[in-house]
Amino acid sequence: MLFHSLSGPEVHGVIDEMDRRQERGSGISSAIDRGDTETTMPSISSDRAALCAGCGGKISDRYYLLAVDKQWHMRCLKCCECKLNLESELTCFSKDGSIYCKEDYYRRFSVQRCARCHLGISESEMVMRARDLVYHLNCFTCTTCNKMLTTGDHFGMKDSLVYCRLHFEALLQGEYPPHFNHADVARAAAAAEQLRVQDWAQLGLTLGLPYYNGVGTVQKGRPRKRKSPGPGADLAAYNAALSCNENDAEHLDRDQPYPSSQKTKRMRTSFKHHQLRTMKSYFAINHNPDAKDLKQLAQKTGLTKRVLQVWFQNARAKFRRNLLRQENTGVDKTSDATLQTGTPSGPASELSNASLSPSSTPTTLTDLTSPTLPTVTSVLTSVPGNLEATSPTALHKRLLPTFSNDSPPPSPLSPHDFFKKEIIFS
């Protein structure tokens, strides 16, 4: 089939050429077998022999390696770090006259270095990126508890150090002193997670932080929303509870969730004016925000949920104290009005009837320094039994007459005189 398209003379010429080549090859092989030097290959002279760049010796082997424009024995081309024989490798790398394998070259001279171990990162290796830093997968761990962080985990960074969410929030709150042992922190965190766990379903994680409802007890699960104050609520109490000078910074204390070997000073957090305004505006609507509301407030104010929980806890306590104080003040005012304008069977009528009894001896007291003052007539009599429970100081404030601003009032009576005298106005 091969010679079918060729003419007769061309076929004979090809066959003759093939026969000549076979005869010449057989002659060379026979000459080599006989040891005839006239037909052997010329040997390399000693002056022109190549030198190995590894050992410096002459290369007399049939095969040798050429790398970095130099000749090498097959046994001499090795990595200077791990001594790996590069004879069967596809690539090798050179730096400052030294030969490296691929792994050692990227480890030592790679442009991308791990921010944790400061070693090189090869181009085929999987990495974790945080901001402008690159980490090995095994190096992307929490600095405190050495927990490996994977895709989807929440973490925080401070000074190029990586923290898990639990320890980063604790670091922001100043829970740990600088000399605190990492092993102790890990043990304390594990114990705290077993004792108190809060449901963070909307965040997709479990976080060991308690929820405080302002009373001092730990509330499990989602907190119950309290009713927001209606339009008829006491606005004066609310304003008194949230009264704060805008020029002053408001501070709050936090409890330490983890036990410490040494007593450390609590850190105090100062709020900015726009943060205070945002929190106060929301407090007027809802005194007890839930986790979703706290998340929205955290995004608006830039504060953590824990800080917001403590602030609302303190605001609720202050609001309740002011309500109790105003209720007590209202009760006192009501009792004063009852004593001054009492019913005929009340203490005031008994007091007036006793003062007008014939057995009393009237005496007149006048202020010599101010003749324009009204005359006060006192009657020596015994005080009824239902007035003995009233304190002398309170009775003095209720029964003394009012004086003009131009003249000073007379000197107050001693508490002992209130049990002997009764004051009436003429």
Swiss-Prot record:
Motif residue range(s): Nuclear localization signal: 305-321
Any Pfam family hit: Homeodomain
GO molecular function: chromatin binding; DNA-binding transcription activator activity, RNA polymerase II-specific; DNA-binding transcription factor activity, RNA polymerase II-specific; metal ion binding; RNA polymerase II cis-regulatory region sequence-specific DNA binding; RNA polymerase II transcription regulatory region sequence-specific DNA binding; sequence-specific DNA binding
Record-level GO cellular component terms: nucleus
Compartments where located: Nucleus
Predominant localisation class: nucleus
Domain LIM zinc-binding: start-end pairs: 52-104, 114-167
Basic and acidic residues bias (residue ranges): 14-24
Residue numbers spanned by region Disordered: 14-42, 248-268, 326-370
Gene3D superfamilies, alphabetized: Cysteine Rich Protein, Homeodomain-like
Compositional bias of kind Polar residues: 326-354
Family matches, as SUPFAM superfamilies: Glucocorticoid receptor-like (DNA-binding domain), Homeodomain-like
Gene Ontology terms describing biological process: anatomical structure formation involved in morphogenesis; axon extension; axon guidance; brain development; cerebral cortex development; dorsal/ventral pattern formation; hair follicle development; maintenance of epithelial cell apical/basal polarity
Start-end of Low complexity biased regions: 355-370
UniProt DNA-binding region: 264-323
Keywords, in A-Z order: Activator, DNA-binding, Homeobox, LIM domain, Metal-binding, Nucleus, Repeat, Transcription, Transcription regulation, Zinc
Top-level taxon in the UniProt lineage: Eukaryota
Free-text tissue specificity from the UniProt record: Found in discrete regions of the developing CNS, primarily in diencephalic and telencephalic structures and a subset of lymphoid tissues. Also found in embryonic spinal cord and fetal liver.
SUBUNIT field: Interacts (via LIM domains) with CITED2. Interacts with POU4F2.
Record's comment describing the protein's domains: LIM domains are necessary for transcription activation.
Function: Acts as a transcriptional activator. Stimulates the promoter of the alpha-glycoprotein gene. Transcriptional regulatory protein involved in the control of cell differentiation in developing lymphoid and neural cell types.
Protein name: LIM/homeobox protein Lhx2
Native species: Rattus norvegicus (Rat)
